[in-house]
From Swiss-Prot:
GO terms for cellular component: cytoplasm. It is an enzyme of class 2 (transferase). Keywords: Isoprene biosynthesis, Magnesium, Metal-binding, Transferase. GO terms for molecular function: (2E,6E)-farnesyl diphosphate synthase activity; dimethylallyltranstransferase activity; metal ion binding; Z-farnesyl diphosphate synthase activity. Mg(2+) 1 binds at residues 156, 160. Mg(2+) 2 binds at residues 156, 160. PROSITE patterns: POLYPRENYL_SYNTHASE_1 (PS00723), POLYPRENYL_SYNTHASE_2 (PS00444). This is Farnesyl pyrophosphate synthase. It catalyses: isopentenyl diphosphate + (2E)-geranyl diphosphate = (2Z,6E)-farnesyl diphosphate + diphosphate.
């Protein structure tokens, strides 16, 4: 059943009319967070027909990716670097640079995207295909996804002039890097396709993978570009429709769809309907994930998330900003308009205080609970051939995250 219909069944008619007065019940799920106010919060907290996560009917608690999986995945990284550097024996300084770029920008982080490829393949492939050779290939493809992540982060940090990433200075802020970070990022991106060719060119799914990765790069670039040109003070850009587009392209495709679709092709799953169903769920997870990111950028613990939030001072088109402007009183709106997008620490604090005064954190937590349950129910509607446990695991690891 489409998630929009599930949403309509879960929410009362008064709340539907309040949140979507012009849609006549035909709501796009990604707009669930649009126009939530005190009435919706009150409904969420007291209506017995909304099932919170603790009352989920899911019988099987999703598994998690194990420490052994992480250890085995990391053990492949030196071989990845070796593959990328041994092709340049006559240019030793370039090989050294590529190794340094990879170590700094790819090997860190939680590696959730890469591990998702491996976990998804284990869940999707038939038993006879789970050979050491294929598991290793899944790990290599996982590193290809991690390399795209590193590529996007280097470019994004440079464009945003961010300060820290994963607990240390952004790559471009290193004294010997600077604007060269742009070409360094391209080395990471080109290395991704080098690995795909080196390890998969004789496989049946090679062309599908190349097209999948190229599509992820193109869509993510669209999203990043629109994100950079949608900053305040152009208040016409602070709309939920624009935000949904940015989120879908900037985050959802490469964070959730790419890893699972990679594993599906590797497991021999080419059925277009199964890919469509998986994509639908995964893009919704990506939207959910980005809303969480927006919240953590403002209210997260910098020591835990490993970076200093900059969305307020950059005037980003974020879920928090849109909800705040929609719910603000005239005086609160005046504060937001005069302070949002400023690098002045006092004005940044005023924006945070105003977010709290408006009740944005409470709206976010209501959104998070409702969305978790709605996506859970969409997962339960997936066809055979798409193991529910796989998608529930991804959702479970996303819910309530602090980094």
């Amino acid at each position: 059943m489409p998630l929009a219909k599930l949403c309509a069944k879960k929410l009362s008619s008064p709340l539907m009319k309040l949140c979507y007065p012009n849609l006549n019940g035909k709501l796009p799920f990604s707009n669930l967070s649009n126009i939530l106010d005190n009435s919706s919060l009150k409904f969420h907290s007291c209506n017995p027909h909304i099932t919170c996560r603790g009352l989920s009917t899911v019988a099987l608690r999703p598994q998690t990716i194990t420490k052994d999986d992480k250890r085995d995945f990391m053990a492949v990284f030196p071989d990845i670097v070796r593959d990328l550097t041994q092709l340049n024996p006559g240019i030793s300084d370039l090989s050294t640079l590529i190794s340094k770029i990879m170590q700094y920008n790819v090997s860190g982080g939680k590696k959730v995207r890469g591990l998702t490829v491996v976990y998804s393949y284990r869940m999707l492939a038939p038993d006879h295909a789970l050979t050491p050779e294929n598991i290793r290939l899944a790990q290599i493809l996982g590193w290809c996804v991690e390399m795209l992540q590193g590529f996007f982060l280097v470019i994004d940090d440079l464009a945003d002039q961010s300060i820290t990433r994963r607990g240390r200075p952004c790559w471009y802020r290193n004294p010997d890097v600077g604007l060269r970070a742009g070409s360094d990022a391209l080395l990471i991106q080109s290395g991704t396709f080098q690995l795909l060719q080196q390890h998969c060119k004789d496989r049946e799914f090679y062309i599908d993978l190349v097209e999948l990765f190229l599509d992820a790069v193109r869509r993510t670039t669209y999203g990043q570009t629109l994100d950079h040109v949608s900053s305040f003070p152009n208040i016409t850009h602070l709309t939920m429709d624009r935000y949904n587009f940015i989120t879908k392209y900037k985050t959802s495709y490469y964070t959730f769809h790419l890893p699972v679709a990679t594993a599906m092709y590797m497991a021999g799953i080419y059925n277009t309907e199964l890919h469509r169903q998986a994509k639908s769920v995964l893009l919704e997870m990506g939207h959910y994930f980005q809303v969480q990111d927006d919240y953590l950028d403002v209210f997260g613990d910098e020591e835990v998330i490993g970076k200093i939030g900059t969305d307020i001072q950059e005037g980003k088109c974020t879920w928090l900003a849109i909800v705040a402007f929609q719910r603000a009183s005239p005086s609160q709106r005046e504060i937001l308009e005069s302070c949002y997008g400023s690098k002045d620490p006092e004005k940044i604090k005023k924006v945070k205080d105003t977010f709290i005064e408006i009740g944005v954190p409470a709206v976010f937590h209501a959104y998070e609970e409702e969305t978790y349950n709605l996506i859970t129910r969409q997962i339960q509607q997936l066809s055979q051939g798409l193991p529910h446990e796989l998608f529930l695991t991804l959702l479970h690891k996303t819910y309530g995250r602090k980094q």
